[in-house]
């Protein structure tokens, strides 16, 4: 398979010989600056909109989320609006995303956040993990992207990159093993 970005491929090939975390991070940053996509949820620290994007991105292509996300946020701009909406309105707004159970979980989550937390998403990853539609990885993503807290998590796509470079011959690699090998010290 041919590489579209020759300079990156040469650097990646060198890196595979003796990968260091610092080299790897630099290379990923350089690649992102050159080829990263401008996505609306990357331009906010709002916990609600980050939560919506994280749940939408579960098993759904970025392009589809990119079109549905602004529509959903415009229709339900906060937890109170989502909690007050009818189930049929939420499912209708979700149409085309697949897995309607995610929309139903978001509605239930919004109701809980309004009832128990006054419409403010908790800053505790264990509480987040206990809410409908949120697993540990989503809780960590919210902690990192909304609250600026260093919580390590392995996203599916970057997981493949980590395994490719740091565990090229391994058949099965746990997230814990990846984190030990590649995670920078948390501040």
Segments from the language model and where they lie:
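Intrinsic-disorder/low-complexity peptide segments enriched for small residues
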Residues: 10-13, 55
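Catalytic cores of DNA base-excision repair glycosylases
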Residues: 18-20, 26-187
